[in-house]
Amino acid sequence: VPSFDGSPLDVDVTRPMPGTGNSHPLIVLLHGFGNDKHEWESITDAADGADKYHWNSHWFAAHGYYVLTYTARGFRDTGPRASYQPATPAGVAPTCLPPGGSACPPTGTIRVKNKDVEIRDTQWVAGLTALAYPDINRDQVAVSGGSYGGGESWLQAAAQAGSEYWSDWPGLPRLRMQVAVPRYPWTDLAYALMPNGHPGGASRTPAGQPYQGTDLYSSAQGAPGTLGVGNPIGVAKSSYIGGLYSLGTANGVFDEGTPSPQSNGPEPFTAWLGRVDAGEPYSTPDRVDDPTMAQVRTAFSGWHSAYYQPGWRVGRDAGRTPAIFSISGWTDDLFPPLESFRMFTYLKSLDRDWPIAVVVGDIGHARAQNPPGVWQAINQRAWLFLQANITGSRPGRTTVSSYPTRCTGSATAADAISADSPADLAKGTLTVDFHDSVLLPPSSGAADPDAAASDAVAGGTITSTSAGCRTSARLTTAPVDGYTAVSQPLPTEQTLVGIGHAQARYAATPGTPTAVLAARLWDVAPDGVAVLVSRGVYRFDFTGYDARSGVVQVPFYGNHWTFPAGHRLRLDLAQVDQPTYRPPNPAVTATLDLSATRLVLPLRSAADTTIR
């Protein structure tokens, strides 16, 4: 069907099963990047038994929902990829690329969930669906999707918060969206693809001074309510960005052309990627981005990310608070839990009764294991949340919940813990004081075999089929072209739950505008086998964001992980962690003189513990 601008979209509608009533909710299920409309379609309730279990077209139709699935603008439809998916045909149109779908230049190109393009596509097609099926309840609409669809689900919630009607087109029914269920989503795409490690959220600086955030659970490209302005451009996730670009060019067509200051204008993704690949420096003195990176900051923050949308404050003031159930993965190295945590924190700061819940587990993109039992438990919780709010979002106390990551055996519903905020999942702190000093030149870490072995794309999942948990590639814990420190054995079992950080005093050599500090956290068993627990990165920008000396905190992606008694904690620090992150350009990168190195980790237990 033609979208709001005439671009063809490949659309399927699954009708509710007989005997499910006379008035029906509508749910839109949005596919991931490089996928198509078939992703959430199923001929059974069980589907894949995990992510799609009781969360697919068959399940919702059996419970009285209309289900709208369509192939996003710019992507081909190559047909069903799993035996449980129905053989719905691909849509075809004269301007679309074979074999069908929604890759239909010049307008039907990938826009990476632009708020004025794909977001409007969904609203338009939902309106067409409600027009075609009058028994759809126009006040009972939900949106859900994973990854690419998760990022859009958040943007759709922002759109509803900012307007009385979610879908409001001349000649089409007006619709209200009550619930969004983003799954392994982004909320700040600029930060998710290029994390800078700087705190976000509320500013700790006086009015008129440069922005400085205060909260590692809200780390972001910039301050909410801006176009991502406040923190420096971060470190590119090279393996993921390269893989996603290849996937997009294989399964679709990216938008290109001369960039526009308007969000609905052309977006030159290939040129932007080329500038990111060229690396630092990204900004000039006084915190001014170079012209191309300024485009990247504005587009990927303000146009493609829910965190920066003005609709949240508008909705707060108008009493419109769509219900949101956001699902993220501790071991998801593409869109870590921070993507849900920052929005939980922000929305609760606007309205403590905003109906937003977050659930985190060993799920999502690689390195995640995605255990079926955890997914089934999470989907049951998501279903109950959806049913409770589809007739109208219900403000009140909501929580953040976490399922532990395990190497052998799956966590169960009984293993989940909950708290009133992401930080409150932990009750105590484990501090590991190494008291070491080390010089890290720009090339430090380049020869470390664990860089490739631990990468989410090159290294695979956290486990392998032959040998339990993925382990360190090193034969010893000795440093390899970087810094490695190992703690004393833990006297008692300790459970990490939260983000945590590596910390050090630093001094950077003068005359260069940037530096990088990448960190990895390992669990070392008594036999010397080390298992990756988490990683993180911080980019120094000495053009006005960072001082030449001070104390740096490198936030980890986080985990819910138990260190048994007798195990030791290992910290790796380096400037190069390739291919996970783009290595810094040596000519413009400072050498870092580190001292007083330590780990600071949030613990589930209430006691504070310090070891060496």
Q: What is the predicted role of each segment?
A:
Residues 1-22:
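N-terminal cap/lid segment of alpha/beta-hydrolase-fold proteins
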Residues 20-24, 29-63, 68-78, 333-336, ...:
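Short substrate-entry loop that stabilizes the transition state in hydrolases
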Residues 134-148:
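Alpha/beta-hydrolase fold nucleophile elbow
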Residues 322, 336-346:
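Short alpha-helix in the alpha/beta-hydrolase fold that links the catalytic acid
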Residues 145-155, 334:
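Glycine-rich nucleophile elbow surrounding the catalytic serine of serine-hydrolase chemistry
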Residues 39, 46, 50-54, 62, ...:
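Accessory cap/linker subdomain of secreted extracellular hydrolases
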Residues 326-328:
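Short beta-strand/loop motif that positions the catalytic acidic residue
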Residues 373-612:
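C-terminal, loop-rich substrate-recognition/catalytic regions characterized by aromatic stacking residues
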